Amino acid sequence: MNAIQQKCRPKHQVLVLKCYPRTAKGAVDVKPNSSELSYLLFYAQSRRSKIQKVGSFLEKKTASDVWRQRIGNVQVTLQILTALIEKTPKDLPLFASCVLQILEQILKSRDITMVESSIPTFEAFCTHHDPTSLLADQAYLRQYLDVVQQYASLASTRAFAGKLEPSKPIALRWRNTGLKAIKSVASSDSLSSVATQQYDLAVPMILENLWTDNEDFLDVLHQRAEMGEKLGGALLRRRTSVATVQTAESESNTNPIALADTAVDMDKLAEEDTGVLAMECLRQIFVATNRSQVHAATVALLKFIQERVSQQEEVVRTDSDGRDSGWAVKMFLLAARWAPVADRFTILVTAMDSLAQQPLTDEALQQHIVLAAMIGALLRSDINLIGLSVMDVLLQLIAHIRKVVQMPGDPNSMRSEPHLPGEPDPRAQTVLQFADKAEQAVAERKNVLLRLQECIGDLATHVYYADQISDMISTILQKLRPTRSNSISGSPHGDKSDTPKSSVNALADEHHADSLFALTVAKIAALRAIKSVLLVANPRTKMSGNLGLSRSHVPIQIWDGTQWLLKDQDGLVRKAYADAVMTWLDRETTSADWKARDETARPMLKTRELQGAALAKRAVSSASAREKPVKVPRSHFLQLLHLAIYDNAIDYIDYETDILLLHLLLAKLVDKLGVNAVRYGLPMIFRLQEDIQDAETPIHKVRLGSLVHGYFWMLTEKFDFEGTVIGRAIHNEIVRRRSKNFWVDGVNLPVPLLDLIGTPGTVQRQPKLPSDEIESEALLPFDERLALVECVCTAYQEQTTSPPQSPAASPGRSFSHPMLGSTTSAIPSIETEHEVPDHIREQMLSEWTREAVLAAVQTASKTASLSGSRSGTTGTNRLNANGGLAANGHNPRAERSSPHGSGTNLRPSTSPMGDAMRKSSLRGHSPTPASNNGDAKEQVTSVEQLKLVLSGHLQPPPTMHGPTTFQHDDSSSDSLVSYDMTPSELSFNPATLPGAIPDHHHHHHHHQSPPQQRPVSRDRKGSVSASASAGGSGGPLNSHPTPDDMYNNSEYVSADDGDDDDDDAVPPVPPIPTGLMAEGGGSPSGSPRGGRLPSSSSSPSSKAQQQHQQHHERAAAAAVAALRRPSTSKRSVKSRGGGEHRALSSSWASMGGEDEKAPGMDLNALLKGIDAHVGEDQGLGGFGGVARPPY
């Protein structure tokens, strides 16, 4: 019967059955007959139509063998399938469904031996499978995913494959089997990119085998996995018997756990082997060069972590040094290291998307904390994320901060005052429970904000392009600005409000609907994020990954329009803003920023624009080559920042912490920017010194006085002139005030740390001033402004004198460009390249008012917009009125190298000729002085006028401090006729003072030219009598000015440049005869331009000449008399010394009648009246003595 049945079978069935050897029922490790298997493979390969029938027959036989527990037959069937797949891989789609059906039957048997035997078949199936079949047949795809799911479930540590809980060794065998199947899928290049759903099933099972509370265990697994990869990736062998004896010939590098004798130790070793296999599986998934696979695996990893967080598992913890660690952070970083370099950014982007999709509720805040910690750990690591869009990630983080601060129930409203320790809490139990929840919610929200701002800072760890840091900070500051389109010209409008309350209201009105940081907590978070960016981008110790990278400095222009944050109503915002600015000054400025910047010079292209500009110049014509590049807009940040400092000193004078904050900010500005900050800070400080007398209480006066003299103290330290008379005067006054307790404790040098000054806006313990000393002592002001400026200029010249640097080898992007702008001065001469530019010197000596600063910024902004909107500008083609040609066809601006004549100077030249009398040849063109307006009326029109100038009879026009200078017509009330009654020129003093340094500029004047006039300081609010000025004791500290004392005058002093013996500077001029001097001594009258003379002075009649000579004699007598009496102005800051050694002052306030013409000043008479003893140092006679009147 059996023989008849065998003869009736088809040939393929007969060939298959001949492959099965005769074995016992329970036999294992059975192999097919080799000769019959070879014939079967030849038959299947030669007749492909029979392969599908072979697969169907094997499927039926496997079902019978599995039912009868014929393990040997099942093993033979699996080996036949493996041989068929490897022999005919192209025909696999014909019987692939049968293979999956056989594997599914074996998996359902729950027999560990049969399932382990199916792994080689599944590996061959995954290796040779065609992915197109999965895409074409959805039923087949579902069948494949079912098999993968069943294999993956075997690796679970929580679910059991059998009906009963297996023993430890059996459980490890099940898990290893599942992990091997997962590794087969991950290793297949064809199946890895087909269905991402398989990783949703496989990755969680892998992570379960890697889950541990010991991070060191993960390091061991990773080390062993990497070692196995280097040694060839040999698969782990099956667990051997515990009784195995190690022979002497065996290798000595055995795991020490394997040498133990107990089963527990062997179980630990087996557990470690399973973990290594799981680590290899996870690595195999992430190393694939498939971005979709990396994305799917990352999503599965994040889901697993979120499940563990919801189960109250600790996946992230903070170390003692503040760094985040934990299982989640470790696995996230490992996945990023394994991923291909070009696909690593996919992991971070996936994590950011997961963070944005998480519901933002108090219950889910822990999920946000964990995700933010993982993102921050990846950003701050040494893993390079090539291809990452930094700005997109930054905007996502900012958007998430916005969501956090807009959560219902502001965290600030949930704060409650803690009860005293040791006393029972009077609140009820339900109230306490609610309070605990509220406090926990506040703490978690703070933690989320802290981690988000740290993530923003960690974005700066790796620099992927030159302007990355600048773009990041600019984006954050743009979100902080009240309006989206905020410009420099609009920033002064926001500064017109004096009080913080009005500024807050204006800010609320101007805030854009999409403005991000309307809340105080968000402003603080943004400013701290900026500080974090600056700290991370400029580490004290460079990372190895950033040594070869270069980037651009963060320019000062990004801070334009942000100074209003210093005037915010909340003290923490003011402190955070000052901290961010000081961090920028500390980390982003270089030694080049300490040098004086000359805005009047030609702008220089950025380094990275040089190559492009050079290539462009080769391709353009000569006409277009004359076109200049667009100027970099000038920053007004320092001007407006000092204005905000001035406002804060007045508005927040009640808070000592605000004074300390301003002291720290001013000290950092002086330390890092030098004269570039002093040019704006010194006039403001002198203006603030004048406002001390307006303070209502003694403590207010002490605070303002400490801030003012603290600034002077900084100058003496930074510019190293403590040993001069000026420096000793400043330090002696500081010592005197400290001895009288008229000083704020924190105003010191070196400055205290910002974290130690407390929170601005908080009232601290008020120091008690001694009442007896308040009535008797006074704060002596410092008024030697000209001498102080000369000390600063001289020290600057000495400190900047250094050997010239060699040019850079290539114009590549470097890290040495200054912050204050890309404009550099033209090639200077040897004598003046290290001197302070004259317009900066004049600015330090100029008046300072709040309105003048705002007007100057507005005027400069309008000028920049007008000049930038047309092709012919002053800085480019010189097509405007200032840059036009003179009448003789000569362009005076083209050849003038002195910055005095520039139209962008803050103040006009104060010499009669304004430095426009250039040194020229006697046979060349006649010197044509080019004033600010370039008007022909301001030129020397006759020889008689030249005689008047050289003899000193033609006085310079009054110096003005506005944006419009020398624009009055002939009928102006401030003309030369009423020169004696001009309130801006009441004091005229020589500048020979003890401790003062003569002003040696690079402008060489003739010895007979009149001295240059400079303002010293703004006049005091409150008149000071002559007796007080001469050495009176003055009023007490708590004195307050009366309305009668509020008359204001302006005091000027002449800084004589001295005689210059340089014959090359000015051509020699023959001496003028006495008769000609008498003829030219008339009082000029007319326009302050100095270019026209009235008809009375130019008349050839003898009567007019006699009147001029009489006027000349009266002028000489009046000048000598004026030099012998004290000034009648309110208070001359140069007359503080007392005695015969104080500087002299002259005044024309009490001249003749109204019909009397103003006299001309005789230079010889003026020089004869100078005291020869001026300049001698007698202790503190002229500086800091008690003879000064108080505020």
Swiss-Prot record:
InterPro entries: ARM-type_fold, EFR3, EFR3_HEAT-like_rpt. Residues 800-811, 867-891, 1085-1108, 1116-1126 have a biased composition (Low complexity). Residues 899-912, 928-940 have a biased composition (Polar residues). One of its GO terms (cellular component) is plasma membrane. SUPFAM superfamilies: ARM repeat. Residues 484-503, 800-824, 861-940, 953-1160 are annotated as: Disordered. It comes from the Eukaryota. Pfam families: EFR3. GO terms for biological process: protein localization to plasma membrane. Residues 1054-1065 have a biased composition (Acidic residues). Belongs to the EFR3 family. This is Protein EFR3. It comes from Chaetomium globosum (strain ATCC 6205 / CBS 148.51 / DSM 1962 / NBRC 6347 / NRRL 1970) (Soil fungus). The gene is EFR3.
